[in-house]
């Protein structure tokens, strides 16, 4: 599924430069120094206010519709619960870009142990991918979710050629995970599996997620889609939190 471009990324303006004018010889330079200090203090104060607002954004989201849609207690989550940076990814297992981007979050987690947790939400936007989503949700009952997800993403080109999932090829793609396939097939239509799938889709609609992958980092979406935009969003969240 093709990505849709969002609003342009905004940039933070630097503080105003200090204007220094030459003084006649012998003039008291205290006013110049005081003026420079005042400008510096104003710049520091503005920076502090900005980042205070960023730090409080996640807690403020808790009482909003967007915060409710991003609540991921039911979702598979990787990382420490105490981590201050929370990445929520809306993912379609048949999405080629999802497979390409998934290692980015894992890389950041490896490089920042204990600081990041990742929650995955499923949306079946591609033809035939709902079966893959059900397999993923059912694999959680055997504590094999992350292994199943990585196996599906790694073999995606075989079971989802041209972004169209082939359900009959999916079971073969996860043969090496160690799942009890009979139990898996019995679980794919379980009520709790269906409920989680419906919740993810409803939350995606509430958040206006129309393409995958879509990321929210501490409640913030990417201003536009791209690898650098995602990295910037994660880097900023890490800098704010730690």
Predicted regions and their residues:
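Generic structural signal for secondary-structure transition and capping sites
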Residues: 54-55, 144, 157, 179, ...
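A short beta-strand-turn-helix
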Residues: 67-85, 110
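Ser/Thr/Pro/Gly-rich low-complexity linker/stalk segments immediately outside membranes or between
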Residues: 52-66
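Short secondary-structure boundary/capping elements
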Residues: 68-70, 100, 196
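Conserved strand-loop elements at the edges of beta-sheets that form or border functional pockets
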Residues: 80, 89, 224
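C-terminal cap of thioredoxin/glutaredoxin-like
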Residues: 1-47, 172-242
